[in-house]
Amino acid sequence: MLSNCRQNTLGHNTQTSIAQDFSSEQGRTAPQDQKASIQIYPWMQRMNSHSGVGYGADRRRGRQIYSRYQTLELEKEFHFNRYLTRRRRIEIANALCLTERQIKIWFQNRRMKWKKESNLTSTLSGGGGGAAADSLGGKEEKREETEEEKQKE
């Protein structure tokens, strides 16, 4: 199962590897003199790259792009539970071919999006006084959910 996940997902340097594959294919078909005439301008070079020993090829990972299926499954899970237990996070990660860390961060981001959306709707419908009351209520709700999560584990 895990090997299928590895084969189906693309690495974090996908764009770089595609560009390298493309340039290697071009190199096979193009004559050597044409290859030497290609100029590399400063804007084509990687920014903040370190050539020293001990640095990885790319220190910062690119943005994770989730498939429609992965997004749908994550949204369904979020609809039922805004907080995951570690066991459930592992199950979802294996099912969707993602890491636990990716699942955790997706849920953190989704909770922030949900919070912003709920604050926006409450301020539009309730007026100015409702925002302070909502923020207090949100803290109590968060505490209750945290206690429920502890009981699940």
Curated annotation (Swiss-Prot):
GO terms for molecular function: DNA-binding transcription factor activity, RNA polymerase II-specific; RNA polymerase II cis-regulatory region sequence-specific DNA binding. It comes from the Eukaryota. Residues 59-118 bind DNA. Keywords: Developmental protein, DNA-binding, Homeobox, Nucleus, Transcription, Transcription regulation. Sequence-specific transcription factor which is part of a developmental regulatory system that provides cells with specific positional identities on the anterior-posterior axis. Belongs to the Antp homeobox family. This is Homeobox protein Hox-C6.
